[in-house]
């Protein structure tokens, strides 16, 4: 497969929801929101509802299944052009009933077979947001990625998101801060 697996993209998209709502990132409500307990490596695993929201981000025409074309659109939006050639292989591995599409059951099964979220997924997610490759994520970069994914947010909103995670007060999110946020049980 490619360096950007089907499951890494699921993870990246599932986390965008939290980046848009920084006030909920560390709330006690999230502790009892249906998230399962931490998985391997101590990382919180998404609930079925979160996975359904991720699935719907891929299912652009809302027909209950993901086509290869829809999957490629998401790859392009994430700047992962190199991975497009691997889409047929990904679908061959995930499309268990052989109908040429990935339905929600197959989507969940693929996630479960992968063992959930890995630290490499979190690092790859960081680099998706770090558009200029300087090792830090700015509010402008967050806004750019979210806009590419069809999420409309203001620069002010993105600044609040960054401040919610920025432990050292430099106005940017570094890898350590990003990993701490993503691996928190309260995410």
Curated annotation (Swiss-Prot):
Sequence ranges of Low complexity compositional bias: 32-47
Which positions fall inside the EF-hand domain? 46-81, 82-117, 129-152, 153-187
- Which positions are annotated as binding Ca(2+) 1? 59, 61, 63, 65, 70
Q: Name one GO cellular component term.
A: mitochondrion
**Residue ranges of coiled coil:** none
Q: Which residues bind Ca(2+) 4?
A: 166, 168, 170, 177
Key words, A-Z: Calcium, Metal-binding, Repeat
Q: Does the keyword NADP apply?
A: no
The region called Disordered is annotated at: 21-47
Residues given in the record as Ca(2+) 2 binding sites: 95, 97, 99, 106
For molecular function, the Gene Ontology terms on record are: calcium ion binding
Question: Which of this chain's residues are annotated to bind Ca(2+) 3?
Answer: 130, 132, 134, 136, 141
Does the UniProt entry include the keyword Metal-binding? yes
Family as reported in the entry's similarity comment: Belongs to the calmodulin family.
Q: What exactly does this protein do?
A: Potential calcium sensor.
Q: What is this protein called?
A: Calmodulin-like protein 30
Give the organism the record lists. Answer: Arabidopsis thaliana (Mouse-ear cress)
Taxon lineage: Eukaryota, Viridiplantae, Streptophyta, Embryophyta, Tracheophyta
